[in-house]
Amino acid sequence: MGNSHTTASSTADDTTAAADPANLQEYNSVAIPPGGIITILSIDGGGIRGIIPGTIVAYLEEQLQALDGPDARVADYFDVIAGTSTGGLMTTMLAAPDKNKRPLYAGKDLVPFYKEHGPKIFPSAGIFETVRDTTRLLSGPKYDGKYLHQLLKNLLGDTRLGQTLTYVVIPTFDIKTFQPTIFNTCDDSPEKNAKLYDICIGTSAAPTYLPGHYFETTDANGTKVEYNLVDGGVAANNPTLVAISTVTQRMVTKDPKFLLDNTSKQPIGCHRFLILSIGTGTAKYGSKYTAKQAAGWGVLGWLSQGDGNPLIDVFSDASSDMVDYHIATIFQALNVGDNYLRIQEENLRGTASSVDISTKENLNALEQVGKNLLKKAVSKLNLFTGQYEPIEGAGTNQDALKRFAKLLSEERKRRITVSAAGGQ
């Protein structure tokens, strides 16, 4: 689930009190003044289970608003927001501009969005349709994706990646080139400045669930560049490491936004990363499948078992866990474990572990999972056992998010103060 944040507050400058909170909604720069920290929000893939991180994000934004006023939005505080699949959709909702150049959606709008549109994106099947759909998995996706496509087209229009209000990182996988394709605002190449609509459809195109997505852009020479995309979860269901890598690449290219200061030209070190990574839940302790069961599965068995898809479930959960393990290892080894908070529910049961069951009962249950997760103890990964253990004295995830919000607010006010003083 993650680590508490107790030490990073020392990065905030004593002059932050001089900043006027009333001006926060007018400040939307991603520039990091000297001495600052890099703030990253990462949201896993997981279909309809996006309601879980949606609940967490809503709570975080509520705490930011308590500190800085009702106009505060998540995108105002994070230098990078990364999301895969359903997380990519939420990333776009939080970072895409409306007509007033403010975030399209507030954190509190995420769960209602999923409750309204989830049943139409993943329509429930009757008994006879269920049998037919299981057989159809051998010849086509479970859902046609038409509602999702039209919804995102209406929502995002022609807005492009380069227009987001903060840096975003959205992984996809190109099945023609057979390699990950990462769309990020840091990438200056014209061919990557695609429409957010296309990127969201691509990162959400989960194999067997939704059709792959094809679209074209042009490079600097006007040459056509084509994309043949499926769900980013194939490559990076937990995009936290991709987000870190993206920032690191910009450091290597001496991007001034990610340098420690303008004099030394030194990159910002790992100790100045402040990361919130939110999962969509897993059935790790639910005994979802067994080797005895899997021993008898053929192609169809691996594609459909009860409410789940074992093949998708296995690689997406494994991908998320390995990323968490690597980051936790690095941050703990560098003695900056407090700068990384992972919030993840590991004990989903029954239909709650499905990525596409969108009945009213399950949607409400997933929201409750998110609310309960807020009340659970902050935990960190034991690198020797691989298990998550509560951190003594760290309180609940709710407490950790309050501390996190305070750090974000302090850093933002510090930036406003530095900016008002001419960047010195």
Positions of PLM-derived features:
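Conserved catalytic cores and adjacent C-terminal regulatory segments
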Residues: 2-424
